[in-house]
Amino acid sequence: MWRSLSRWSPEDDPDLAHNTATVPLAERFTPVPPNRTARAGRARIASLVSFAPTAGNPAQGSPTADYYALTHWAYIDELVFWGGSAGEGIVLAPNAPVVDAAHRNGVRVLGNVFLPPVAYGGDLRWTRDLVRRDSLGRFPIAEQLVRVARTYGFDGWFVNAETDGGDSALATRMREFLRALRAAGEPHGLRITWYDAMNSTGRVGWQGALNALNQEFYEDRAGKVADTVFVDFRWTPDTLVASGALADRLGRSRHELWAAVDTESRGWDADVRWDAIVPRSGDHVVSYGFYRPEWTRNHLTDRSPGAFHHADDRFWTGESLDPARPAPEGSWRAPATVVADRSTVAGLPFACSFNTGHGLRWYENGRVTSDAPWNHLGLQDRLPGRRWVVDTAGARPSVTLDFADAWRGGSSLLVSGSLTAPVTVGLHSTRLPLTRGSVVELVHATGSGPVTVEVGVATREPSAPGEPVPYTWLRTGSTGAGAAGATGWRTARAALAPLAGRTAYALAVRITAPGGTAVVWRLGALSVHDGARTRRPAPPLAPAVDAAARQDGRAWLRLSWRAAGSGPGGRPRHYEVHRVLPDGGRRFLGGTCGTALYLPGVPRAGRERAAVFEVRAVDELYAVSAPARTALSWEP
């Protein structure tokens, strides 16, 4: 079972560039919460997500918008790339797009080591082989797991030993294996989460607790073994209280214990004893971990991106869809009402085109450059963490991420409804240092009558949780339908020189419509930067077709290039690949944060002799480099 892992080396891996995450883990900060119940520094949230069946996870996105495009990173501390099976493989490393999106938002991602129950094809020999020492007394599989995580760029392993039939000697060897895994990985920032299954007898006996039978996999006499423990679903209020107390006695944090919350089949209708985990009064008892929150997509009959994000917003924010105004307490305790959100928007330049990482089309500068559906989380923007804080003295409009039009990527922020009073929509929580040259830019459009748009910049935080954000408002002008020509989009700019030397803590927009008219207004992009943008990023180097197969006028090919050098804006944010058509037009084929992309089923255009491809580097402000070209010849 472990032969392929034992023999793996990055030097011999032909798929390495396709599977390697490149975005470093961003630092996070915690703004003042928008409500009085969310707490900072207490319970945390882990999320165990199956993005696709084990063998069905694409390396770099796929041609469908029907995908669990998670965007509520602000509430998550750790994401487990859930999967593994006896028939498909029991070690599952996360794909690069998920890791890149998570890291951009400061979230760690763990791969999964799954030793399945015998009833699901498990074999105790696999467990024994996993924890076997070599002739020098080392654990070679532990060393390889660390090597894989470091090479592919993710953050550690979730270890789930559910194959029954072991004994205490096997349990001891498992604990020693975890220690070796930790010793090899900790210097590189890697983490271990242990699932509450195997106990110190070597048998599988889910405790629903941290207790004397399983604590040695978390903390033994020599110190820390695992960083966190995922406490099985069998927990009770009493066992969680006892678990937290034991963690305290061991000198560890009770918030390193994830109480399992099963949302796979019922989502927000799940029967959860919330007060046993995160009581409204008193300290949080432990943290919690969602099992399969992708229910927000899987339960839908309408699997469109818009329907998914509406459901996902309700799951994370609550029924009110406004974290500053939580709905009356019901059976579902939304994370936004429990855990303080976090952000990574702490440096210039910053830009967001409200791209969720999937879409029905691909847009560039307001024009469609591909009409094919797609997903790739590595292309996702850092989106506002609070969906959506809306302030108005009149009727509340609809505020959504919408996929019918976009400035760049696949989506935009849509505000629609009758504006009977000015409407403020909170956007990003930030820590942006402002200078005399700082400017804020909005790319926006209206499909209705004229509106006045102002941008809000808060140079201090609210005085307490639940208090309003104190914005300073800057006028950007008025716009009406068609004001920007063919695409309907226009760019508005406001100088931030009056705020120089201060820090921007939050950004917002305020929209006013004359006479309370119905409004359809889109925000396509938001950016804050210093000074004029005149220099493009450096182009990628040496693009090449590494392999190709041709059949019936189509080609399946592997494309690669060398990383562009760091330009004036630093390393590229990502790369984009286009097809150059015989008439000179361009069609978007895909993007990646890495330096390789698989292109399936590229059709021949007429009788062209070769398909020409362009690769461009894209920086943090979405400026694009000059193209680097390569071509694939068609057979006569």
Predicted regions and their residues:
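Chitinase-like catalytic core of GlcNAc-active glycosidases
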Residues: 38-242
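Extracellular carbohydrate recognition and processing domains
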Residues: 464-503
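Solvent-exposed loop/turn segments flanking beta-strands in beta-repeat/beta-sandwich domains
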Residues: 450-452, 564-586, 607-608
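Extra-cytoplasmic beta-strand recognition segments
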Residues: 413, 417, 425-455, 492-495, ...
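Beta-strand-rich modules
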Residues: 597-631
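Short carbohydrate-recognition loop motifs
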Residues: 395-424, 478-483, 583
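Substrate-binding cleft of secreted/luminal carbohydrate-active enzymes
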Residues: 1-22, 257, 261-396
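Conserved aromatic anchor
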Residues: 552-570
